[in-house]
Every structure is written in C-alpha cells, then in structure tokens.
C-alpha cells in the first residue's frame, strides 16, 4: 500500500448526498477480485451513456477534473452495500482522499485499508472546500495528514481529526498484511517458544 503523508492535487466537487457504492462501482463490475482496472468504470452510470460515450457534464469527464486526486462530496458518502470494490475503483482512478460531512461506516473503514484518506468535516467547511474545488485545475488543494489540515488554493486551512492508529498505518503504507509483517520477529519468537513448551502440537 502506498504511503499517504501529504497530497496536493485537483479536487473534484460532487455536491450530492447519499452517493452509494453501487453509484461508485455498479454491480456488473464486481466479478473481478483484482484491484486494478476498476478505475475506468468508476461512477460508470454517471460518467457514460448507454452507448459508452461520455456524459460531458459529469465532473470527472470535464478536462479540469480528469486527473482529480481528491473528491469533495455531500453527506453519507459510500452508503449502500459493503463492496470493497468501491475504494478499489476510486484508488485505481487516482483518488487518494475523499472529504465529506459523513461516511457510511464500512466504506470509511475500507478506505483506510486501501490507502485512501476519508476526512469528515463540518458542513460549513465542506461548503468552503466545495467552492474552492469548483475553481478547477488551476486551484490545487493540499491535504496534510501529518499536520491534519486541509488547505485551499487561497491559503485557508482547516483542521481535521483521524484516529492515531489509522493515521500511523496510512503514513507508513501499512495494510493488514503490512501490519502483520511488522510483527514477524515477535511471531517467530512465539512459535519457537511454543514449539519448545508444547512439542506435541
């Protein structure tokens, strides 16, 4: 998992509430267990017409936001079914941070496990960030996980809070496997001691 320390990039405004996981990655794309390749179908039914052509006014199809790395969204982002493909699709597209007033719990947890930083901000702050995101590619937002701040293109800075353990994992690029590998020496020591104490096992 890639480390997340500080990100400066284009933020895409998505002022919608209840963006669910089926909107993020529709069910017909869930047949794979590969984490790569899902980005092209991110928000598929919002990005494309039935004939496969792009819907021009969808934010991620607009030239200013095609390389967006941050999404600023409305309330209850990631609700619906608990598919882990949703953060996989966001990450594969290039999204490393989602800012919203609230998240569905399972989606929120899955983001941290897949290298995406979900940030909860109060509505008045999200409104400011949404307006800044509407400035397009010339306005670049900065998310500093170490300082726990989001800074707009004009220098306004807003604090946020992240659980210290999750912050540690993101900043060090540690998923569940990485966390286990940090304890390899302790695990080996335990197994050797257990083998000595209980050789019949």
UniProtKB/Swiss-Prot annotation:
The keyword Methyltransferase does not apply. Keywords: Amino-acid biosynthesis, Branched-chain amino acid biosynthesis, Leucine biosynthesis, Lyase. One of its GO terms (molecular function) is 3-isopropylmalate dehydratase activity. SUPFAM superfamilies: LeuD/IlvD-like. It comes from Cereibacter sphaeroides (strain ATCC 17025 / ATH 2.4.3). Belongs to the LeuD family. LeuD type 1 subfamily. GO terms for cellular component: 3-isopropylmalate dehydratase complex. GO terms for biological process: L-leucine biosynthetic process. Heterodimer of LeuC and LeuD. The keyword Isomerase does not apply. It catalyses: (2R,3S)-3-isopropylmalate = (2S)-2-isopropylmalate. HAMAP family: LeuD_type1 (MF_01031). This is 3-isopropylmalate dehydratase small subunit. Pfam families: Aconitase_C.
